[in-house]
A protein has these predicted regions:
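TPR-adjacent "capping" and linker segments in tetratricopeptide-repeat scaffold/adaptor proteins
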Residues: 13-19, 47-60
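Alpha-solenoid helical repeat scaffolds
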Residues: 29, 44-47, 82, 116, ...
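TPR/TPR-like (Sel1-like) alpha-helical repeat modules
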Residues: 32-35, 142-171
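Helix-turn-helix repeat elements of alpha-solenoid scaffolds
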Residues: 34-41, 70-75
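Alpha-helical adaptor scaffolds
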Residues: 55-127
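Register position in tetratricopeptide repeats
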Residues: 70, 104, 138-139, 171-172
């Protein structure tokens, strides 16, 4: 899955988001690409849109799973997210949250699988891209990590943490 996900990252610029995602994300990402923008506010708004689901129960389940992750109730979070991705397989943030959970549990293969699905549905998901880059770096795949961080910066040029990680990877002071 790792190699297929890197191939998907290479094709992200030509991919379109899933039709289930709100069209207003397009406008938010256009603004985020501008050098002079309030990137923090735009990022927060994008995350809010990603966390939202038209079915209230799905949004509540995602919020609860996020709370479970924050409280380190990982088994409960995994159960909630398993149910959520089964019930709403086109909900990118459900897949991304489960990828995050698996990353925290050092279950990288499962995390990459869910990142792959996230990026299939939302190719602009800079959070998923940064997560994948971190996994690449932890595997010692420096060039792959740099490639994926660069893809994240193409989507969101204001990701200072990605720039810092790239500098550390280039200088050999990280991962």
């Amino acid at each position: 899955m790792y190699a297929e996900t890197l191939k998907l990252v290479a094709r992200l610029p030509e991919r379109r988001p899933a039709p289930v995602l709100p069209a207003r994300l397009d406008q938010l990402f256009r603004h985020l690409a501008l050098p002079a923008c309030d990137a923090q506010d735009l990022e927060e708004e994008i995350w809010q849109v990603w966390m939202h689901h038209p079915h209230r129960r799905a949004a509540i389940a995602l919020d609860r799973a996020a709370d479970d992750i924050a409280a380190q109730r990982f088994d409960l979070a995994e159960t909630r997210l398993e149910r959520l991705v089964r019930a709403c397989p086109d909900f990118p943030e459900a897949w991304n949250k489960r990828a995050t959970l698996y990353y925290l549990l050092e279950r990288d293969e499962e995390s990459v699988r869910d990142i792959h699905r996230t990026l299939e549905l939302e190719p602009r998901h800079f959070g998923a891209l940064c997560g994948l880059a971190e996994i690449c770096a932890s595997r010692g795949e420096r060039d792959d990590a740099l490639f994926v961080f660069q893809a994240a910066l193409r989507v969101n040029p204001h990701l200072d943490s990605a720039r810092t990680s790239m500098e550390q990877l280039r200088s050999g002071t990280s991962h």
